[in-house]
Amino acid sequence: VRMWQKYLEKAGYKTAYINAWELDFATNPLVSILGEVGSLTGKGRKEFKKIIKALPKSVRLGAEGFISTYTGQEAIKNLFNRHKSFDEDITSYCDQKEALQQFRSELQNFIEVNCGGKPLVFFIDELDRCRPDYAVEFLERIKHFFCVDNIIFIISVDKRHLAESVKGHYGSADIDTDDYLRRFFDIEYDLPTPEI
């Protein structure tokens, strides 16, 4: 993976390498991803600051559902519901949707300024070795980047181990992990086992 990254860098591509296993202490994978984007700023420091400014609202996207779903604590969900009316929920949804669009727009602008017309390539390594909750959250976070032009994610994983993480995270051996993971991977390539 590192050789591929160096090859692309020599060809003029901006790349970022993320060893997810080393970073699974973080509570929010998006922070790790954007930290790597920040290291590529070059002449786009101003554009990067706009991305960060748009970030806080977009990070809240789905936070209430995440808390109640993944902690299993209905009381937390009820706490949110007691303090919101239906109109406030709709307004909040619209604000979050707008913030996510703004985040994507600022990220697109950053790529245009910094990447010379070429894609920004993220190499994600060791995701299959992470805690199941972090691995799934990482995938769920990067999906928000998929509709931004000129971003490519190359994810190096042992798919069998990642599938086990998905099963462990959702607490079900019956989940169709191939179907779930297909949402995140457009092209798959299996490396042959080396003959020693």
Question: What positions do the PLM features span?
Answer:
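The catalytic "switch" region of P-loop NTPases
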Residues: 1-7, 104, 109-120, 131-196
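P-loop NTPase nucleotide-binding core
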Residues: 3-111
